[in-house]
Amino acid sequence: MVQRKKEGVRDAILEAAFRLFSEQGYSETSIPGIAREAGMSTANVYVYFQSKIDILFQLYSPWLLGRLDKLERAQRRVADPQERLRKLLLTLWRDLPRENNGFTNNVMQAVSTSSGNGDYSPALRQLFQSRVAGWIQECLATPSDESDMLASVALMAFDGFAMNVRLAHSPPCDDDMARLFSRLFAGAAASSAPTP
């Protein structure tokens, strides 16, 4: 017998998971715990989601895509390319990792503990990097392969700031750091530009 999925049940699972991921972190949250929090059986959770990482990405993907759209609109409002790059790095390294009580830290926990059995898809990360590379290319007028490399470095730093957001003595990204790295990125782009 095929079980019919109900949107209200799915939403209850996602709400319960969000609460637990926010309070306990990804590593300390379990499917049975999510089921208890949502007031249902563990088996019922598996009717709606394949795994804990699936639940996490059902929460994280729309949030991240919304933030990237918002960031794109903010980028369009800044005329100066160097200032646009500084604001991009500040958003990536300070603002996004801190939002929702450092919720992005859960993604770092999930990816670092993924078993490699196909439960993690890099599609969202690839989209994220592609959009960041496009913005960097607009700011620095670099070839796409170099913009992609710079975006990769920017996202590795994003990962680090997302992991550190919950540590008591970790230095956060601030305006001075974003300004310094925007100049470093610009210098790297300028040094690789062909000379006339």
Positions of predicted regions on the chain:
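Amphipathic alpha-helical segments used for helix-helix packing
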Residues: 84, 96-119, 167
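N-terminal intrinsically disordered/low-complexity leader segments
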Residues: 1-7, 192-196
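Hydrophobic alpha-helical connector segments
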Residues: 58, 72-98, 150-154
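Amphipathic alpha-helical packing segments from all-alpha helical-bundle domains
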Residues: 65-69, 87, 115-142, 148-152, ...
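Helix-turn-helix
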Residues: 12, 16-54, 58
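C-terminal peripheral helix-coil segments that are non-catalytic and often amphipathic
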Residues: 94, 129-141, 152-153, 157, ...
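Hydrophobic/aromatic residues within well-ordered alpha-helical segments
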Residues: 52, 59, 63-67, 81, ...
